[in-house]
């Protein structure tokens, strides 16, 4: 097993103690521990896995404290933390991970105050913030993520007022606003972002006329409704 590259333990009963046996898998690049009872203590056993490129911890018992054990995984490109107890301040431990491109924080306790730790991850090109506690007040700060191409804000309270900054993300290709309180005012905002290729407005207040106008003015964009 020394040369194992991928290991999937999704939905198993693997424990923190059990993860101790993974510490010698020095070649592993992809590890999926989603939907397991793993806690911060278990992550301490993964700190030596410095070849990891993808780590999935969604719906585990991991908190901000556990992220300190990931701080030396400089090859990490993707990190799944959705559905965990993360509040956000633990993301400061990931600042040195210059290869980190994708992070999932959906369904966590992330809020306006802790978003500042997210925007320090400058290499991100995909960010999932579905179902978090973010509001219009903090969303403009995302402009500093200049490499961002995919942003999911579904099921948040973000409205048109918080999206006036959208033109500041010139590389944004996909925007998820499913079940957000946005209406036809969104049309003028996103039409200033002609590079958009996917826009999810399912469950919003956008009218039929609004959708038609979007499709007319953004002919290259797939409108999901």
Task: Identify what each model region corresponds to.
Residues 1-208, 217-225:
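Concave beta-strand-loop units of leucine-rich repeat
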């Amino acid at each position: 097993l020394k040369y194992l590259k991928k290991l999937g333990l999704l939905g198993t009963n693997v424990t923190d103690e059990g993860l101790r046996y993974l510490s010698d898998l020095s070649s592993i690049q992809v590890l999926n521990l989603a939907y397991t009872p793993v806690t911060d203590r278990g992550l301490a056993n993964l700190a030596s896995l410095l070849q990891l490129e993808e780590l999935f911890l969604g719906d585990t018992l991991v908190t901000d404290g556990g992220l300190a054990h990931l701080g030396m995984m400089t090859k990490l490109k993707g990190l799944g933390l959705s559905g965990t107890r993360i509040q956000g301040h633990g993301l400061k431990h990931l600042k040195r991970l210059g290869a980190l491109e994708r992070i999932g924080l959906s369904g966590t306790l992330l809020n306006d105050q802790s978003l500042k730790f997210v925007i320090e991850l400058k290499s991100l090109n995909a960010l999932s913030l579905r179902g978090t506690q973010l509001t219009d007040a903090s969303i403009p700060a995302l402009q500093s993520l200049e490499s961002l191409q995919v942003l999911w804000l579904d099921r948040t309270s973000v409205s048109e007022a918080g999206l006036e900054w959208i033109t500041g993300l010139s590389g944004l290709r996909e925007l998820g606003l499913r079940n957000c309180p946005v209406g036809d005012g969104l049309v003028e905002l996103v039409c200033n972002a002609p590079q958009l290729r996917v826009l999810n407005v399912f469950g919003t207040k956008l009218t039929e006329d609004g959708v038609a106008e979007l499709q007319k003015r953004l002919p290259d964009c797939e409108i999901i409704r």
